[in-house]
Amino acid sequence: VNIYLLESGGRKLLFYMSPIGAPAAGAILHEVKALTGAEKFIVFGSCGVLAPEVCADKIIVPTESYRDEGFSYHFVPAADYIEMNGSAAVADYLAAKKIPFVAGRNWTTDAIYRETPNNIARRKAEGCLSVEMEAAGLQAVADYIGAELLTFFFGGDILGESWDMGNMGGEKERARQHGLLNIALELAKEI
């Protein structure tokens, strides 16, 4: 993984593209901290949306993540959910900048394409707004190595009784990615 250094406002910021899935993303986070001494990580990207009526056109800030993957259990004690410790800092920043967002539970799974209607219904009933493949594992590694993790998403596809491509692919998704990169840069300058 290539790691890039940017100096802005007298601060050094490192960037890298995290791989998909908690094991790969978590291993890279662990190695980046060991190699660079970085103590704070901002992670952002797309997610599947379980509650489009709540999440439409808003940044999603996970407050807890359902641990439907095996990776996180190697780093922190077993529990259904892991607290996303940086969520308050992200929410406070977005609120101060008047950037629309919603905060709530998330679902991390490592079973790609297995967001079945029954699983979706269960997670929605527990208050999950989104689903993705890294957050719980990354938080577990961050907790284990003593790093601070700040996470936020933008809605990609929409999962429910049927699948909707939503904002996946194309110019709209690229624009969202660039917008979130700018938010991450500004957030990094303040933490």
Roles of regions detected by a PLM:
Residues D80-E126:
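Active-site rim beta-loop-alpha module in soluble metabolic enzymes
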Residues A136-K172:
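Zn-dependent metallopeptidase/amidohydrolase metal-coordination segment
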Residues V1-A89:
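Metabolite-binding pocket within alpha/beta catalytic cores that recognizes anionic/polar moieties
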Residues D68-G70, R114-T116, I158-W163:
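Short acidic/His/Gly/Ser-rich catalytic and metal-binding motifs that mark active-site loops
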Residues I112-A140, G146-E148:
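C-terminal accessory segment of soluble enzyme catalytic cores
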Residues L159-I191:
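His/Asp/Glu-rich mid-to-C-terminal helical/loop segments that flank catalytic regions of hydrolases
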Residues A89-K97, V141, I183-I191:
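Generic non-transmembrane alpha-helical segments
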